[in-house]
Amino acid sequence: MLFRSVVQFGKTTGTIVTLPAATGTGNIYRFVIGVTATSNANIIKVANATDVMDGSLCLQQDTDADGTLKLWRADAGDDTMTFAGAATTGGIVGGFIQCADYKAGFWSCQAWTQSGGGSEATPFSATVS
C-alpha cells in the first residue's frame, strides 16, 4: 500500500487493509469505495494492539434521499473501521476514507460514506488485540 495515493476498494467480497504501525511519519492513506461490497465488508484496521484511531465519520443515511446525515467520532480505544456494503455502516460506491499517521500510536481517520438505509451504526470499533 502506497501513501500519498488513492487505494480503491474494488471487490464485491470486500477487502481488509492493515495500516502500518503509527510512528508519526505524517503519511496519509486515502481509500475510495469503488465497488459496493455485497458480501463481507471493506475493513481498515491498525497494525497492533497499541495503535488507535481518532477522528470522525459523516454518513449519508440513505442513498435514495438527500439531506439526512449521521456523524460519529471514534471512541477511545477504537482501532478498526468496517464499511459493510449496503448495510448500516456505510460502504456504498463513492465513499472516501483518509487515515493520517500523525503521532506514534495514533491514526487520524476521517470518512464520508453512504448507507443503503436502516438503523445506521458507527463503523468504528475495537477489534485488534
Region annotations inferred by a language model:
Residues 1-70, 100-129:
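Exposed extracellular interaction/assembly regions and N-terminal maturation sites
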